[in-house]
Amino acid sequence: MTDMIGIKNISVFLPGQEDTFFTGVVRMKLYTVSTGDTAYRYEKSIVVFFKGARKVLSTSVFNGGYHENYKAVFNHDGKVGSGMPCEMLADTYTEHMRILAKRIGLEPELVTGMGTAADMENVAIESLTYKELTVTAIVTGGIETNGGRVGDPADYYKPAEKPDKLGTINIILILDADMPPGTLARALVTCTEAKTAAIQELLAGSNYSTGLATGSGT
C-alpha cells in the first residue's frame, strides 16, 4: 500500500492534456506519479486520483487524520477572482469543502481536501528518486501578505462554527513506499521542516515580527 501525505516548492508547471469530466468540468492532466496516481486541474482545483489503496495522513479540517479508504485528495483556490476575496459556500469550513468535493464530482466521504488563496495554474510539481523510492511534491503557495514565524503573536481567533481563513501553503506529498503510520507521521514532520527551509532560503520575512518567516499565518 502506497503512502500519501496531504498537508497545510520547487519546479515548473507541467503542461498536460485536456478532456471533460462527467460533471462537464474541463480538466487538464498535470502529472502521473510513480505510483500510477494522476493529478488533474479542474479550473480552480487540483485533484489527485489514487490508482489503488493508499495510506493517507492529512492535517486538513475536512476529513483529516489517518485513513486507508480514500480515493482522492484535492486542493482548491477559494478566490472569487484574481485579487478578490475567498468565497465560502457554507457557514462552516467543513461543509464548504464538502460542497466543493461534490461540485468536482468526488465522494465527500472518501476524499480529503485543502483550501488556499493561491492560483492553481502556479502549482509546482517535483519528483526525486533514490534507488527504489520516489517522492513527489505537489505544491501551491504564496506568503507575501501572510508570512509568519513560529512564536509570533497571534492575530486571529476563530470561535467554534465560524468560517476558517483559507491556507496559503498547501503540499500534497506522495511516497511510493509502504510505511507504518508512525513513520508516515515522521515524514510529515520532515516535509514541514523542508517547507520552512525553503522559505528561509528565500529570506521571506514575517508580517507579524522582525524575524524570517517559517510558514504562513494560516
Question: What kind of region is each of these model predictions?
Answer:
Residues 2-4:
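Extreme N-terminal basic, low-complexity initiation segments
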Residues 6-218:
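Alpha/propeptide regions of enzymes that mature by internal proteolysis
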